[in-house]
């Protein structure tokens, strides 16, 4: 209104509102950013809140414990030191390795179980990794006669998958499951916790650090 009067405008047609006031921000790409927000739409915070858009920590495909770890890491990135970050990464890695398979596996939806199934080789060439894990799960659950305890993975199922260290007893680097990890397959000791942590925590964090 003041500006309209100053320039002697015929009619006031400029309307603005304040969205966020932040003292720090990191952009990795268009619509992918983190802001250290002190004021959001007129609401003032006693402590800054992180606003994240398009970042791994807010994606459902990231294991839940890592989403929290990443948010805490981003907070340190905004307000802490390099030594704080190194200490936090070491602490998070140690904590991650104590978690059960169900918590550190990647959540996904699977839609092509039938498409990639092979009667001779379990799965066909070019099968996506989470789908390959699903077909391997189905195969070994049937082989071990565990279908009374575990439902087979079907198209449209929400699943989790995790990487396995090789060599192992199924000669594969992946296994999927629906809700409970099938410990009867004796694969839990082969879970690659280092690779899981690298892909679900270190790589998303590195993408932010590289942008600084």
Range-by-range predicted roles:
Residues 2-212:
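DNA-dependent DNA polymerase catalytic subunits
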